[in-house]
């Protein structure tokens, strides 16, 4: 029953994106980031119960199958146009499979503060990918908004993080390089998805996501079978695994991935990546609300810079015609 309600909620959110109300779309962007920020804790729980690659593969395959079921119920076309086959395979390998594998391996050797800082560069990599793939122009005003976002990140990490700044290590080792690579590949994947949505209008974003998730999930499970111990499967706590995977599939794969993909039809990947910088701030809120952690003192300042940067980028992209009020 909970899963059915969540799926109905996801469909409602995705429908609202294309109503001619930009305020509602902006609200959905930040609501999506708010929901997505819970996936870190859920992923940690899942990895406590099973091997990381098996977790990734299981959730991707399960989510893809559920999406295919929803599309069949809605009687949407699942036929892949020939020009879309290779881009979807590329999206599956780069945007889903490699991104998740590199992220999981890199996070095992990094502190949360360093990981958050590296993820803070995603709007810059998204802007570069948009320039290369979609020929979207990066203006000085947009760079100013991105810089404000970076300032907000520095304020949050220096004055609002949960770890002592003195404990930070700034050496560039293998974990840092893996996470930087995951950030770049993720930005490339979202830009490729936006490009696919433009060129293959006969195929819905949900269908593209379904194909990409199943392909990436199968690759992850094959990788897991080669590198992780299956006896008979790499799961130590079946109940916790099922609970965590179920929550991840519903909140991350079904709601957030698909809503983000829908939003890419109306907004650039640069703007959406910038808005997703608030995810660590929302994670701090969850920590304060659910775990009783102290409220970070730099949080309000970071949010203030984030709002200013968001307005700059939004108005500039609206002027450039990259923001659509309706489809």
From Swiss-Prot:
Keyword Transport: yes
Subcellular localization: Cell membrane
A GO-annotated cellular component: plasma membrane
SUPFAM superfamilies referenced in this protein's UniProt entry, alphabetically: Multidrug resistance efflux transporter EmrE
Keywords assigned: Cell membrane, Membrane, Repeat, Transmembrane, Transmembrane helix, Transport
Membrane topology: Multi-pass membrane protein
Origin: domain of life: Bacteria
InterPro entries the record matches: AA-Vitamin_Transporters, EamA_dom
Transmembrane stretches, start-end: 22-42, 53-73, 85-105, 114-134, 143-163, 165-185, 202-222, 240-260, 271-291, 294-314
Residue ranges constituting the EamA domain according to the UniProt record: 34-157, 189-313
Pfam families: EamA (PF00892)
Keyword Nuclease: no
Protein task: Transports S-adenosylmethionine (SAM) and S-adenosylhomocysteine (SAH). Allows bacteria to acquire SAM from the eukaryotic host cell and to likely remove the toxic by-product SAH.
Family stated for the protein in its record: Belongs to the drug/metabolite transporter (DMT) superfamily. 10 TMS drug/metabolite exporter (DME) (TC 2.A.7.3) family.
PANTHER family to which the protein is assigned, alphabetical: INNER MEMBRANE TRANSPORTER, S-ADENOSYLMETHIONINE_S-ADENOSYLHOMOCYSTEINE TRANSPORTER
Protein name: S-adenosylmethionine/S-adenosylhomocysteine transporter
